[in-house]
Amino acid sequence: MWCFNPRSSIEDLAKIQFWKALGAEFIGTAVLVYIGCGAAVTSTPDANRDAFVTRVSLAFGLTVATMVWAICGVSGGHINPAVSLGFLVTRRISLVRFLLYVAFQCSGAVAGAALLYASTFDSVKRGGFGTNSMATENGQYLISPAQGILIEAIITFVLVFTVFATCDAKRSDLKGSGPLAIGIAVLISHLVAIPLTGTSMNPARSLGPAVLIGFWTDHWVFWVGPMLGGAVAGLLYDMAFAADASLRKFGECAVADDYDPDADDRTIDTKRVNARV
């Protein structure tokens, strides 16, 4: 399937399963924001910083693991535009699926933030409300937006690389729970990055709280960094580290009209290759 071919997008729109998948992404992302950001806004970071970081890291990591487990059979359990981008650039989903996944993920994030806003006390609403921002001290930035992009790209790379590894159907060594491995990737990334950027690694997660309280300072960082990390991780794993990675797979991904990322035979039929400049 050539992911930018209108035919593949129309085929998606005609399937009832596709619309179920959109609903699953909406619910999964809403729950992620409500639980993850809820753990952040109901904590007191100044009292015990280490306990705060651990609490929030566990909340996000375990929620991701739970929701991926719950909806992976319906939508793939992306609940993150950066994950969806990784699947787009490796031609595993169509363009319309990517765009609507992101739209429903972002809508779900705003809905989750709205539910959190409606169910918490006023002092929480006057605070940062789980928004992401660069680390500061005495009103001065400790890291620059460029450093923020780098941090977010790295931790999102860890997440998406793990997602692709757990979804590699041709690996014979996979054991244990894939959703748990993905949740652990989120957890360990939060342990590192909460003191630096608040840890986004998910543009939708950053968008929800920002919409509710109107906080947009450096918000673009939490789109650029995660999307960059997600795209690089998806391409690198699929083309270099997957069980069936090869130069032939890379070539077919680049030029074949009906590329199948999970095909057993990687030989390219030259009659169906349509090279693009």
From Swiss-Prot:
Aquaporins contain two tandem repeats each containing three membrane-spanning domains and a pore-forming loop with the signature motif Asn-Pro-Ala (NPA). CDD domains: MIP. The keyword Membrane applies. A motif (NPA 1) lies at residues 80-82. This is Aquaporin-5. The lineage of its organism: Eukaryota, Metazoa, Ecdysozoa, Tardigrada, Eutardigrada. GO terms for molecular function: water channel activity. PROSITE patterns: MIP. InterPro entries: Aquaporin-like, Aquaporin_transptr, MIP, MIP_CS. Belongs to the MIP/aquaporin (TC 1.A.8) family. Probable water-specific aquaporin that may modulate the water content and osmolytes during anhydrobiosis.
